[in-house]
């Protein structure tokens, strides 16, 4: 855990495997108005995909499939979605079929709090 000003930053676990078959549960105690999460996926050497999500409610969150931002060279596409706090991914090639990968996934939680 790192604390910078009024923000606690925490990486809880690094996940590895086929990103198309991994689901990550966001803890309810972190899903709170004002908190946020960064998700970083490295499906192949030389490319990373990243997204940030600001929680707009307490407890349970859902989000329709959205594109992630690419850094590096990768001809495939990456999307993420959240359903009842479960984050899932879709990594596909140009033919809209799941692309082969052995991904590393990091979820970084940002918990905001007021100084006392």
Language-model-derived ranges and their functions:
Residues 11-34, 44-49:
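Surface-exposed ligand/attachment interfaces on beta-rich extracellular proteins
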Residues 25-32, 56, 109-112:
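Extracellular and analogous surface-interaction loops
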Residues 4-5, 52, 81:
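Beta-strand-rich, repetitive solenoid scaffolds
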Residues 66-116:
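Extracellular jelly-roll beta-sandwich "head" domains, especially the C-terminal globular C1q domain
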Residues 44-52, 56-76:
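Terminal beta-strand-rich extracellular "head" domains
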Residues 1-23, 113-116:
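Glycine-rich, low-complexity segments
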């Amino acid at each position: 855990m790192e604390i910078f000003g009024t923000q606690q930053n925490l990486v809880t676990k690094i996940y590895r495997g086929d990103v198309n078959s991994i689901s990550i549960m966001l803890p309810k105690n972190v899903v709170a108005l004002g908190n946020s999460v960064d998700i970083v996926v490295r499906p192949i050497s030389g490319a990373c995909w990243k997204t940030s999500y600001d929680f707009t409610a307490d407890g349970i969150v859902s989000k329709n499939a959205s594109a992630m931002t690419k850094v590096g060279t990768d001809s495939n596409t990456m999307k993420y979605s959240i359903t009842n706090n479960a984050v899932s991914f879709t990594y596909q090639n140009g033919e809209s079929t799941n692309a082969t990968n052995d991904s590393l996934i990091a979820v970084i939680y940002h918990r905001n709090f007021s100084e006392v």
